[in-house]
A protein has these predicted regions:
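Cysteine-centered catalytic environments shared across enzyme families
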Residues: 1-162
Length: 162
């Protein structure tokens, strides 16, 4: 049960506070990505990969950034399907999801490629676009709220409460 958090502004202190409040969601580490447009944070609970492989926020080769909590059930099948295009450096499904989101539209990835339980936030730096997503059943929660300056989001509702 990882934790993902963010705000659509440069404000690392708010995300540090949320990470601290929700630290039990990920005892294997936490980290933050911050730009002028977005600040993303992550608490890591490593289950299927080594803790150093799953460190997030995950920055892709295209400079896009992903924070993710979940499991891709068809991970091994997708490794075979994309073996001529995707060359993983880890055993972490975060790396695969990041690559897929770099290559295909969000809708294509969610509707036609992955079979998963998830919540994630993907920041496309080039397009200056942020996508928030959770599985249709809400197994991996993602809460959000409007603020005076944008949107704040968290794996737990208490991350949104001051």
């Amino acid at each position: 049960m990882c934790g993902i958090y963010g705000i659509t502004e440069k404000n690392p202190q708010i995300i540090k506070n949320i990470i601290s409040k929700c630290s039990y969601r990920g005892p294997n580490g936490s980290s933050i990505y911050s730009s002028e447009q977005v600040t993303l944070g992550h608490n890591l609970l490593s289950i299927t990969s080594k803790p150093d492989e799953g460190k997030q926020p995950w920055k892709s080769i295209n400079e896009n950034v992903l924070v993710y909590n979940g499991e891709i059930f068809n991970y091994n099948e997708l490794l075979v399907r994309f073996r001529d295009k995707f060359y993983p450096k880890s055993t972490c499904d975060t790396e695969l999801l990041s690559w897929l989101l770099d290559q295909y539209s969000y809708e294509e990835v969610i509707q036609n490629i992955i079979d998963s339980m998830h919540s994630f936030v993907f920041y496309n730096k080039k397009k200056n676009e942020i996508v928030l997503s959770r599985d249709h059943a809400g197994i991996k929660p993602l809460f959000f709220a409007n603020t005076k300056t944008g949107i704040i989001f968290s794996s737990e509702i208490k991350g949104l409460i001051n």
